[in-house]
């Protein structure tokens, strides 16, 4: 397959999986509330591609970016040629459910927990699609080498990992960082990210930005949406305050964690806002 044909094949396969997989829907058996039964978690994703040797990967080793613990694409897969990143927008039902109150809605909790499980299943599926086309592929989030550290495990950090999906999305041309340190894409900021490293040579997505936060208009709407005042125009997001609030949310539904208030009811919820 030619690179453009392979990318189209991937897009079609990913879209079919997102629309048809039972993992993208909440069953009656697993629902936290009656309103969550039949809930669709995500819409079809945006996809971006970067060359595995893009110089920006090395820049992620800077402590101001990800840090020296960040693994490079060849660390995940020998012969890596491309990195595929995908952003799955939350469904309309998930977004609307989370507009009111200080606590995340049950729908948002599902999108955060079952949603992440689905993102990993999608990563496995993308790897299978590439292998079926004759290439090797690895989903870092599904790999035994994937490591994440949270504030409650190590008080010296709020959160870090050796493969940052947000920074990968930035390198792959999907979007830039917001004041909340999430990613703003052409389909907004309310969604989740995943990625795959492959030996396939795929068309690289142009990065229509040069700065790390070019898509953020600094409107401050997310500041007003945060229930724990963890965001400011001057310093951005206080990761410790945010993470502590997430830990508190675990007490409501054991095994579930989430907030997402800064991702809804804001100009960047559905799209990339236009600079005034």
Residue ranges and their predicted role:
Residues 1-111:
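Non-catalytic, usually N-terminal nucleic-acid engagement modules in DNA/RNA processing proteins
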Residues 101-276:
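Catalytic cores of enzyme domains
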